[in-house]
Amino acid sequence: MSNPSDGSTDPKTTFMIEEIQELLPHRYPFLLVDRIIDYKESERAVGIKNVTMNEEFFQGHFPGRPLMPGVLIVEAMAQVGGIVLAQLPDIPSGKLFVFTGIDKVRIRRSVVPGDQLVITAEFLSLKRKRFAMMSTKAEVDGKLACSGELMFAMVD
């Protein structure tokens, strides 16, 4: 993929929110990736999610002690994985991979307002050009918050 924003033919390594919205179908309040800060085609993406007190889920999780729900951390990891899968070279443009399963997921620390999640998704495998597996992790200040293997399936 070329980088049309600067006229170069170097591979694109970062994505702003508008570009993420071209690759993922998610929208507010469920788009949980603010930016991709490192990308290597067919291998990995590193994204960030700035966690603010304005997130809707903090209204009920938990009043007086806001914690980002673990399932939403996992969803953010899946969305970063979706950036990699949406651009696999052997997959027709416009195909959608959906999150279908999790293995070995562990939540290791709380994520609170003011944290910045740094999410890494590494491509592991693609079977029958339809089923994919990613290794993912989310860190805050260099400390592991969550990790696991995520499965995806392409839908028609």
Curated annotation (Swiss-Prot):
Lipid metabolism keyword on record: yes
Sections of the chain in a coiled coil: none
EC identifiers of the protein: 4.2.1.59
GO-annotated biological processes: fatty acid biosynthetic process; lipid A biosynthetic process
Top-level enzyme category: lyase
Reaction(s) catalysed (UniProt annotation): a (3R)-hydroxyacyl-[ACP] = a (2E)-enoyl-[ACP] + H2O
InterPro entries in UniProt: FabA_FabZ, FabZ, HotDog_dom_sf
Annotated active site: 61
Gene Ontology cellular component terms for the protein in this record: cytoplasm; membrane
Keywords recorded for this protein, A-Z: Cytoplasm, Lipid A biosynthesis, Lipid biosynthesis, Lipid metabolism, Lyase
Subcellular location(s) of the protein: Cytoplasm
GO MF term set: (3R)-hydroxyacyl-[acyl-carrier-protein] dehydratase activity
Main location: cytoplasm
Function in brief: Involved in unsaturated fatty acids biosynthesis. Catalyzes the dehydration of short chain beta-hydroxyacyl-ACPs and long chain saturated and unsaturated beta-hydroxyacyl-ACPs.
Family that this chain belongs to: Belongs to the thioester dehydratase family. FabZ subfamily.
PANTHER family attached to this UniProt entry: 3-HYDROXYACYL-[ACYL-CARRIER-PROTEIN] DEHYDRATASE
HAMAP family linked to this entry: FabZ
Protein name according to UniProt: 3-hydroxyacyl-[acyl-carrier-protein] dehydratase FabZ
